[in-house]
């Protein structure tokens, strides 16, 4: 996360004084012309400042129990395999992001978006899908369980989805002799939802016999 620390020579109290001065100037202008964009600007500056000062504590996982870190899969070994969309410790990053999501919920954040963009399975489906499923399965399950144990799941809707699915038929791309992947399939795909007062164990909708 960028820009959490001030540049050298700018202590927090000086930054706060500068923001207060800027807000006073904007407030004076707002009282004269009542432009709502000025009020929005004041609110945006204040929100940015609060986020900057609150983020270091939020992303510090050192006080989390070892059992919690293990449940999410933080610092677990790489599941092995994969390749497309894999940068560094992808599996650990996703686990930490899920844990950070729970910490954000505890602090009243209303909307949280976690992205894992490695599902472009036009080829090498067997290995790629196995790897990506291994990356996300444990952290997502831990997030839902953690929210439930803390009494936060009923007031939090967890949605796991993508923008489209994959065709039920194979795709041959890149000169492969065999169809090793799946193409885009926006006509039928699934999402998982938990919490938010929803009744669990339900399935809505279905495909025909060949997945359309």
Where are these regions (language model features)?
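Ligand-binding pockets and gating/stacking loops
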Residues: 1-212
